[in-house]
Swiss-Prot record:
Residues 65-80 form a propeptide. PROSITE patterns: PANCREATIC_HORMONE_1, PANCREATIC_HORMONE_2. This is Pancreatic polypeptide. The modification Tyrosine amide is found at residue 61. It holds the Pfam family Hormone_3. The keyword Protein transport does not apply. One of its GO terms (cellular component) is extracellular space. GO terms for biological process: feeding behavior; neuropeptide signaling pathway. Belongs to the NPY family. Hormone secreted by pancreatic cells that acts as a regulator of pancreatic and gastrointestinal functions. InterPro entries: Pancreatic_hormone-like (IPR001955), Pancreatic_hormone-like_CS (IPR020392). GO terms for molecular function: neuropeptide hormone activity; neuropeptide Y receptor binding. It comes from the Eukaryota.
Length: 80
C-alpha cells in the first residue's frame, strides 16, 4: 500500500487543478481609449484591434468545407 502522504499529495494536486479557473481560449479584445485620448493611444488601439481581428478571423485549416456532400466518394471515385 502506498504511503499516506502520497495519496494526500495526489488529492491536493487534483483539487488545486480543479480550483484554478481555465484560461481564455483567445486574445482579449482591446479596450477603446475614448474620444479625447491622445493620438498615440488611438494608434496603439487601432494596431491592437487589427492584430486582434487578424487572430480571431484567421483561416482554420483542416476543417471540412460546407459545400462538400456527406455521401460523396473520396477523391471523386465512382461508387459500386
Amino acid at each position: 500500500m502506498p504511503p499516506r502522504w502520497a495519496s494526500l499529495l495526489l488529492l491536493a494536486c487534483s483539487l488545486l487543478l480543479l480550483a484554478v479557473p481555465p484560461g481564455t481560449a483567445g486574445p482579449s479584445q482591446p479596450t477603446y481609449p475614448g474620444d479625447d485620448a491622445p493620438v498615440e493611444d488611438l494608434i496603439r488601439f487601432y494596431n491592437d484591434l487589427q492584430q486582434y481581428l487578424n487572430v480571431v478571423t484567421r483561416h482554420r485549416y483542416g476543417r471540412r468545407s460546407s459545400s462538400r456532400v456527406l455521401c460523396e466518394e473520396p477523391m471523386g471515385a465512382a461508387g459500386c
